[in-house]
């Protein structure tokens, strides 16, 4: 796809990083193509709190033990959070360069096994934030115990929303850490966000 772009196309390309090795390698290949064609681009931190290479021990090597890693990583994140939200400017000119004629029916599997997930997960940013709010209001205070019992609805169930970019871990951290000093279960939940990055 990127190799078909022409230098005369007036566009800028933006994307968020995905941190699996194959994706990082692909990012480098895309960078080379865009630089060669003189097309401007910018990529941003993915759905994480910190870039992995920014959290190291004093000697510059990666942490091998979770507790010191997370103590350091959480502080780096807190120190970097801006004090107030910046205003997001709307894009004035946008061009759709994806001309796929595939319909929803064509790209979905022939068997409708995926329909059962409708009762568990409704994909949207709005639903992700509703789920987070419901978890904070009703279950986070007992998360430390309830998460260990599959028969209890004790987890946040936010994984698919995080995976598909419908909620950012920074929003989860910000909203769920408000009462962190009052409840050890909240601390345990926040630590789970750290495990994603470790």
Each model region followed by its residue ranges:
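Trp/Phe/Arg-rich N-terminal binding region typifying the photolyase-homology
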Residues: 1-81, 185
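Glycine/tryptophan-enriched, flexible segments
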Residues: 62-197
